[in-house]
C-alpha cells in the first residue's frame, strides 16, 4: 500500500500498522495509526488502502467536512479528478466519513485501476483540504 501511495502521489505522513484484537474490522485516524482486528477477511490490500485514506485525512479531519455540501465533494481538485475518471457529470459523494466511488469501502471496488484511482482521489482531496502533500 505504501508503494502505491509513493508511486502515484506525494504524501508526507508516517503510518503505523497495529494488531488490535478489540477492533472488529479495521480502523484508522489522522494521527497515522491503522488498527486491524482478528478477522482475516480485513487483512487485505483493499482494506489497508481504505484505512490509509483515513490516516491521510479522509473523513478524519475538520477540513474534510468543510469540503462537503449535501454529501457532495465541493473542492476543485477532487471534482476535477473524479470528472477526469468518470466524465463531466461525475461527482464524489461522502457520508461524512467515507467517500465513493473509489473509496475502497467494499471488496467489489478492488482492482489495479481502482487502487490507482483511489490514491489519486485521496491526493486531490488533500490538496482541497490544504493538508498535502
What kind of feature is each model-predicted range?
Residues 46-60:
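Active-site recognition of the HExxH zinc-binding catalytic motif
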Residues 42, 63-133:
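Metalloprotease/metallohydrolase-associated module, dominated by Zn2+-dependent proteases
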Residues 12-33:
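Catalytic zinc-binding patch centered on the HExxH motif and its immediate surroundings
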Residues 2, 33, 49, 53, ...:
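Extracytoplasmic/secreted envelope proteins and their assembly/folding machinery
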Residues 32-49:
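Short pre-active-site segment immediately N-terminal to the catalytic Zn-binding motif
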Residues 1-13:
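Zn2+-dependent metallopeptidase catalytic core
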Residues 6, 57-61, 126:
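Hydrophobic/aromatic-lined pockets within catalytic cores
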Residues 20-26, 39-43, 62-64:
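Solvent-exposed loop/turn segments at secondary-structure junctions
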Amino acid at each position: 500500500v505504501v508503494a502505491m501511495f509513493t508511486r502515484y502521489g506525494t504524501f508526507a505522513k508516517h503510518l503505523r500498522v497495529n494488531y488490535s484484537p478489540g477492533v472488529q474490522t479495521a480502523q484508522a485516524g489522522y494521527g497515522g495509526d491503522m488498527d486491524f482486528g482478528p478477522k482475516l477477511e480485513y487483512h487485505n490490500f483493499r482494506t489497508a488502502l481504505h484505512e490509509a485514506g483515513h490516516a491521510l485525512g479522509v473523513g478524519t479531519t475538520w477540513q474534510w467536512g468543510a469540503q462537503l455540501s449535501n454529501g457532495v465533494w465541493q473542492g476543485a481538485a477532487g471534482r476535477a479528478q473524479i470528472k477526469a475518471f468518470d466524465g463531466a457529470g461525475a461527482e464524489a459523494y461522502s457520508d461524512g466519513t467515507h467517500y465513493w466511488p473509489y473509496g475502497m469501502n467494499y471488496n467489489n471496488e478492488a482492482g489495479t485501476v481502482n487502487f490507482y484511482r483511489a490514491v489519486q482521489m485521496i491526493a486531490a482531496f488533500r490538496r482541497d483540504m490544504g493538508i498535502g502533500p
